[in-house]
Amino acid sequence: AGLAVCEDLGLVPDLAVGDFDTFGLERMEELRKKEGWATDVHKPEKDETDTDLAVRSALRAGFRTAHVLGATGGRLDHELSNIHLMRAAKDAGLFMEIYDAKNRIFLLTPDDEEHSVFRKTDLYGKYVSFLPLTEKVLGITLDGFKYPLHNKDISILENPSLCVSNEVPGESAKISFREGILI
């Protein structure tokens, strides 16, 4: 699915990984020869998803950031797996961002200063949401957001939607928290 998105948007990948069952191997090979990008082709019968294999290939190739397209394309099981895969990628040293037509999804940890500031000019849409990936996220402070928070805890079980659909009314806003993982 990701390669089809690249083709639709006129993007050239650095590396395309998967079984290419939905895109087609012949079509993939034609594009690869024309545009000169690398591939890592796998059989359709495997224990990992294409995205999991892509993360492993990106790590082996020394990438530090992965922009993943086609990871939210209609199957909830794959979408949730890909969101959880962001944690494994981050633990291995790869910052993974998932893009689709309406969303830019990435993982935040308390020590991630680089991705904790949200500049209005860099936003992917109007809204910014923070969802707990761990059972609890402690001490969330939202400065500069339309709906600020100060040292608030959120939990998957108690208030998982507290930080959904916030906005950045000024030039920038910042999030900080003590413990947990957010997407």
Q: Could you tell me what each predicted segment is?
A:
Residues 2-91:
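Acidic/Gly/His-enriched mid-domain segments of enzyme catalytic cores or analogous surface patches
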Residues 45-49, 104-106, 155:
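A short acidic, often aromatic-flanked loop/helix-cap motif at beta-alpha or helix-coil junctions
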Residues 108-183:
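Long, charged alpha-helical interface segments
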Residues 44-50, 95-99, 125-133:
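Short, basic, helix/turn surface patches
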Residues 14-15, 37-39, 65-67, 95-97, ...:
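Structural motif
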Residues 77-78, 87-123:
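Class I SAM-dependent methyltransferase SAM-binding "motif I" and its flanking Rossmann-like core
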Residues 70-73, 100-102, 134:
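Generic secondary-structure microfeatures
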Residues 60, 88-94, 135, 152, ...:
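Generic secondary-structure signature for well-ordered alpha-helical cores
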